[in-house]
Amino acid sequence: MSSLDVHPAPSHRLYRAYARFGFLPTVLVILVVALALFVPRFLTVQNIFNVLRSSAYLVILSAGQMTVLIVGGFDLSVGAVVPLASVVSALVMVWAKGVAPDQTAIIVLLGVLAGIGSGLAVGLINGLSVAFLKVSPFIVTLGSLSIATGVALLLTNGIPVYGMPQAYVNGFGRGLWLQLPTAVYLAALIVALVWFIQNFTRMGRYLYAIGGNLQAATVSGVRTRTYLVLAYLFCSVLAAVSGLALTAQIGSGQAVISAQLTLESIAAAVIAGVSLKGGVGRVEMVTLAAFFLLILTDAMDLLKIDPRIQTIFLGCIVVLAVALDEVAKRRASVD
């Protein structure tokens, strides 16, 4: 070996790894170990199942939000697409059950397609408005949020929709496979799909290119409008899938599921290091961030911390995450 060979110091290698992956994996491990040691109820089977199931819904939702953020967009409507898909799918299943009560597979299929279709409709409105009409993503998705919320409430009058096939509720929503909730496998499948798109497809490369520099991508021949629409469609479809999974778990269509879904999906993306300016974001980090948020929330629930304080604390965590990642990126660029 030549004396001129230069090897980076271990500390530099560790720092570059930190700059690439951020603080999240370390903090997540520390949090889990601390909870296991000091909060005995955290390791109960029921609590672990609840965390895994809740994390799965947020992972699916956040993967879609990340896709829109990568192209430099923003989607406030995901929190309304979830209940919209919930009530639409439930209403269609109840209707189909009355028409053909013995055709469970067809009943479920029609409901699922209707729920996903509602997500596609919202995503199409958002995508076309942003890509072709040049409407601000914030404004158009805020409008879609209001529309989707209003439609869901109008369809149900705020009353839960019961009567879905028990095979759908017990088999998919509350079922276990290899001792894990089925929602976990659904989330894992979607994460694998998004990871594949990001790393091995033309669409993945183009989405990053659009978020990095829209004008340069256009000059390079990328059909930027088409891929912008696809990004918003993909985001809304994943929100609808999350809504379908939640509906199956709850056992009814709900027009009001959670007021914080949009905030949580954005928080997971930001904590994961997804750039709000576009062009940066990895689905594996978003998955870890979703787990981090749900474990943190679960810990505060177990410790009986006031929900109002929880909201403040989570907001502080988001701000701190953005600050730490920004410092790490600046130091990495200097080195």
Regions found by a protein language model. Give the residues of each.
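Alpha-helical transmembrane segments within multi-pass membrane transporters and channels
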Residues: 98-145, 288-292
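Helix-loop-helix "hairpin" substructures at the membrane interface of multi-pass membrane proteins
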Residues: 107-115, 121-126, 179-254, 265
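Transmembrane alpha-helical segments in multi-pass inner-membrane proteins
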Residues: 239, 249-315
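Cytosolic-side transmembrane-helix boundaries in multi-pass membrane proteins
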Residues: 1-31, 219, 223-226, 296-335
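Helix-loop-helix hairpins and the membrane-proximal interhelical loops
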Residues: 14-56, 244, 248-253
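Hydrophobic core segments of alpha-helical transmembrane domains in multi-pass membrane transport
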Residues: 24-37, 65, 90, 115-119, ...
